[in-house]
């Protein structure tokens, strides 16, 4: 019976959010021809509430025009968490968009991950971003946690290709100034 299939479908997802399971079930069962609006709504809800890049791919593939896909990218940047945004923009190779996003989100926990994805494409811009982050941290105070954060960012700066000389100069400035 249909009820039995629904029960079987949900039985192996008991540990997860029931709403998410229901939405995933509805996405699988919606007829794209007759229920395209419902399908889009359910797919959008999955992406923006649960932040799974696979949901982005599904939703993107439902879009029929480039303008719709561009609008979806804008929505992703405003509604998804930074980790998901990083994954999606990287997978889509939207490096300029990811760089702009990183510039606006330097205080995010995932900022180093964004830079790792970008550093081969924009080494100078990534180095400059890190320079600003480290300088701001140095000027914000003292303390062990602050020192650990600065050291972590400095290690990331050191790994940006082609910036070895600039890194050495910046570290010399840091030692002289602070």
What is each PLM-predicted segment?
Residues 1-178:
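Eukaryote-biased, non-catalytic alpha-solenoid scaffold regions
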């Amino acid at each position: 019976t249909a009820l039995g299939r629904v029960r079987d479908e949900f039985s192996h997802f008991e540990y997860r959010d029931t709403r998410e399971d229901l939405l995933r079930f509805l996405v699988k069962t919606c007829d794209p021809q007759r229920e395209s609006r419902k399908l889009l709504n359910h797919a959008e809800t999955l992406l923006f509430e649960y932040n799974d890049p696979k949901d982005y791919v599904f939703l993107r593939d439902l879009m029929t025009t480039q303008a719709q896909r561009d609008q979806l990218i804008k929505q992703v940047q405003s509604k998804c968490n930074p980790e998901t945004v990083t994954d999606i923009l990287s997978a889509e190779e939207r490096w300029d968009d990811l760089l702009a996003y990183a510039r606006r989100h330097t205080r995010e926990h995932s900022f180093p991950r964004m830079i790792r994805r970008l550093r081969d494409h924009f080494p100078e811009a990534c180095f400059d971003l890190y320079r600003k982050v480290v300088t701001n941290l140095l000027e914000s105070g003292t303390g062990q946690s602050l020192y650990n954060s600065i050291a972590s960012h400095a290690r990331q700066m050191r790994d940006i290709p082609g910036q070895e000389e600039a890194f050495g100069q910046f570290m010399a400035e840091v030692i002289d100034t602070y």
